[in-house]
């Protein structure tokens, strides 16, 4: 006669709970969360924003069916020296950013921390340039401080 797999009974709750725990490891979201894999691989190291220096301005081609050159910048992060690409949101926003400017970047808001819409491989966007909001610069409300 084969033994029972699951414990039965009025006080078997704790044992059942312990038995179910091992199946959590097959869930990829649980595994990534518990082992902190996002923080380990993330250039921002789990932080919401990061400061960096602009290395160069680039134009990235939009994915099909759209046809456009999305303006972006290559940024070297100050805290760890990693280089990432950040999108510059707004009409003519790239004109307000020069090489060697200090920028603050944050996630672009795509699904699962990935890229957004038709911009391939870009997971970050520029928020501030030399401590001034990029949005304000584009609207013309504020000017970039002269060095």
Swiss-Prot record:
Family, per entry: Belongs to the universal ribosomal protein uS12 family.
GO biological process, one term: translation
InterPro entries noted in UniProt: NA-bd_OB-fold, Ribosomal_uS12, Ribosomal_uS12_arc, Ribosomal_uS12_bac, Ribosomal_uS12_euk/arc
Gene coding for it: rps12
The protein's name in its UniProt record: Small ribosomal subunit protein uS12
rRNA-binding recorded as keyword: yes
HAMAP family: Ribosomal_uS12_A
GO cellular component, as recorded: small ribosomal subunit
Entry-linked PANTHER family: 30S RIBOSOMAL PROTEIN S12 FAMILY MEMBER
GO MF, any single term: structural constituent of ribosome
Entry keyword annotation includes Cell membrane: no
Keywords: Ribonucleoprotein, Ribosomal protein, RNA-binding, rRNA-binding
NCBIfam families named among the record's database cross-references: PRK04211.1, uS12_E_A
Function: With S4 and S5 plays an important role in translational accuracy. Located at the interface of the 30S and 50S subunits.
Binding partners and assembly: Part of the 30S ribosomal subunit.
A Pfam entry, by short name: Ribosom_S12_S23
